[in-house]
UniProtKB/Swiss-Prot annotation:
Xref: InterPro entries: Enolase-like_C_sf (IPR036849), Enolase-like_N (IPR029017), Enolase_C-like (IPR029065), Mandelate_racemase_C (IPR013342), OSB_synthase_MenC1 (IPR010196), OSBS_N (IPR041338)
NCBIfam families: menC_gam_Gplu, PRK05105.1
The organism's taxonomic lineage, starting at the top: Bacteria, Pseudomonadati, Pseudomonadota, Gammaproteobacteria, Vibrionales
Domain of life: Bacteria
Stated name of the protein: o-succinylbenzoate synthase
Annotated gene: menC
EC number: 4.2.1.113
Molecular function GO terms recorded: magnesium ion binding; O-succinylbenzoate synthase activity
Length: 324
């Protein structure tokens, strides 16, 4: 007999977590728990403020409706729901059917969100390929260029991933590039969405030789993966994109064109983050995923992230807001 529960969580965040225009003091989300009588599986639904098209209340309504359809054995169109619900519910179904491999890729590209000196220490301790991520576009473009150049100069075997979140005008993007030595530019794996408009980002790549990646563009209406000069990767954030099936389609399309596909976090709890690590190991085994976000939290949820010492919130401690 099928049963389902929906939990709601609030997890405290590190004080330094800033989204586009606001400080994120706590992460709010829902956990769906599905049981088929033999097995139980979970998925996380956590719209990200300022990035998701839906809010938590809209997600809750979609989730209850979809869960009722599942309990009634109706034919499900998971992607007809808002993206965070499509992702979390499809992940729970994948787990329930035992189709998500247990092995995870927990190697991360460390995120430089504070003192650059801290990142240098962290990178020097890394074995294997050294890849780091830096958020750019929040300060002056010239400063961002100088910081990127400094890392590439200090650590000769370092590759950088940069994320501008469409933050620059073409002029600002040019200022950034002017402060990155041409000899180091090939070690920028990609710069996510440097300019406000995709065509401006393509022009930037053509002019500078710096590879770019699509992130926000992946979620634009009618997006298709296609080979374009200068585009090295697509960044897939399942909470913002939709179902696991939809994400896998994007990965396969990118790989067919010789592009990287990077599974990336939308600041989910450790529960979903570990599932994303398993998805990454399964579908993008040769690419380091973008999952270095657990340290933005003050607490884990239900499932531990390897080597993380943050305290754990048990699912049994959460409020059940719906069950059947």
């Amino acid at each position: 007999m099928k049963t389902a529960k929906i939990y709601q969580y609030q997890l405290p965040m590190d004080s330094g977590v800033i989204l586009r225009d606001q400080r994120l003091q706590q992460r709010d989300g829902l956990i769906i728990e599905l049981s088929d009588g033999k097995h139980t599986a979970k998925g996380e639904i956590a719209p990200l403020p300022e990035f998701s098209q839906e809010n938590l209340e809209q997600a809750r309504e979609d989730l209850i409706s979809l869960t009722q359809a599942w309990l009634n054995d109706e034919v499900l169109d998971v992607d007809a729901n808002c993206p965070s619900v499509a992702f979390g519910f499809s992940m729970a179904l994948l787990e329930l059917e035992n189709n998500l491999p247990e092995v995870g890729n927990y190697q991360v590209a460390p995120l430089c969100s504070g003192d650059p000196d801290d990142l240098v220490v962290k990178l020097n301790e890394m074995s294997g390929k050294k890849v780091a991520k830096i958020k750019v576009g929040m300060y002056e473009a010239i400063r961002d260029g100088m910081v990127a150049n400094m890392f590439l100069e200090l650590i000769p075997d370092l590759s950088l991933r940069l994320d501008a979140n469409r933050g620059w005008t073409p002029k600002k993007a040019e200022q950034f590039a002017n402060y990155v030595s041409p000899q180091y530019r090939s070690r920028i794996e990609f710069l996510e969405e440097p300019c406000h408009r995709p065509e401006e980002s393509l022009e930037f790549s053509k002019a500078t030789g710096i590879a770019i990646a699509w992130d926000e563009t992946v979620r634009d209406e009618g997006f298709e993966v296609k080979a374009q000069d200068g585009v090295a990767a697509i960044v897939i954030k399942p909470t913002l994109v939709g179902s696991v099936g939809k994400c896998i389609e994007l990965v396969e399309q990118a790989h067919l064109l010789g592009m990287q596909a990077v599974i990336s976090s939308s600041i989910e709890s450790s529960l979903a983050l570990t599932q994303l690590a398993r998805l990454a190991a399964w579908k993008t085994p040769n690419t380091i995923p973008g999952l270095d976000t657990i340290d933005l939290f003050k607490m884990q949820l239900d499932t531990p992230w390897p080597h993380c010492e943050l305290p754990m919130q048990a699912l049994s401690d959460l409020e059940v807001i719906w069950e059947s």
